[in-house]
């Protein structure tokens, strides 16, 4: 978990790979269709002409780079208006691909403080599109608390609600669709083959609000996993 970013971390266990199947390219096309532009990731200024990827050749090359797990830095950057986010793929095991959709905290909180709620909605919209289009087993926005490990996800050992949560169809069956549907939340809807649960929109930028705590008590009682103190140290 990076203290410089807000990370939505998702786990895909469905084959073929989201890269070789063309699903990742389709996701990028969806983002560009609603006004996002791919950039080279140079932060200031994001909109500089030299930072924009204009041609299909440049975009295809950026996607191939993001899908090349032999490369250390595989980040795909997207931007529109006052909001930007990035996608990062990894393959922790032969059968699992993780994708992380993240935003830089300095841009999210400080670029324009009056737009923090708008940025939260932009982030949620980007996540919603991604979980709708990619075969996602589970996903969560890790802010104050560590996400579950790959092993915990594959074993269905989910014991916390985060500010944004996605449960794929297999987890819905394991945990119980009716139980998840009845969890108190600002947003609790079907997306793709799974369920998207956002206990409190404000929690995306405020952390553990009382609504998130209530939703956790409803689903999991008082037994919760380890947290961090904001500096990466385990409490």
Where are the language model's segments positioned?
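Short helix-loop boundary/capping segments
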Residues: 98-164
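Intrinsically disordered, low-complexity regulatory segments enriched in Ser/Thr/Pro
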Residues: 80-114, 118, 182-207
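Hydrophobic beta-strand segments of well-ordered beta-sheets in folded domains
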Residues: 4-9, 41, 135-141
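Charge-rich, solvent-exposed alpha-helical interaction surfaces
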Residues: 23-26, 30, 62, 122, ...
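C-terminal interaction module
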Residues: 2-4, 10-34, 147-235
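A common structural junction motif
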Residues: 26-38, 133-138
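Short, intrinsically disordered low-complexity segments
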Residues: 34-98
């Amino acid at each position: 978990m990076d203290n410089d970013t807000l990370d939505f971390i998702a786990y895909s266990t469905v084959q073929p790979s989201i890269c070789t199947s063309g699903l990742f390219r389709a996701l990028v096309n969806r983002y560009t269709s609603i006004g996002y532009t791919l950039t080279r990731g140079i932060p200031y200024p994001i909109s500089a002409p030299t930072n924009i990827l204009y041609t299909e050749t440049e975009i295809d090359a950026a996607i191939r780079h993001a899908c090349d797990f032999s490369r250390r830095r595989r980040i795909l950057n997207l931007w529109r208006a006052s909001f930007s986010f990035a996608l990062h793929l990894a393959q922790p095991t032969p059968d699992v691909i993780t994708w992380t959709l993240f935003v830089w905290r300095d841009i999210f909180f400080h670029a324009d403080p009056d737009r923090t709620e708008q940025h939260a909605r932009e982030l949620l919209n980007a996540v919603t599109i991604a979980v709708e289009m990619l075969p996602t087993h589970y996903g969560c926005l890790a802010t104050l608390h560590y996400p579950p490990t790959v092993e915990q996800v594959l074993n269905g050992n989910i014991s916390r609600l985060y500010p944004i949560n996605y449960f794929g169809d297999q987890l819905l069956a394991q945990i119980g669709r009716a139980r998840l549907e009845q969890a108190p939340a600002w947003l609790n809807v079907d997306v793709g083959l799974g369920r998207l649960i956002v206990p409190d929109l404000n929690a995306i930028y405020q952390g553990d609000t009382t609504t998130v705590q209530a939703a956790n008590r409803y689903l999991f009682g008082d037994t919760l996993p380890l947290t961090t103190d904001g500096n990466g140290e385990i409490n």
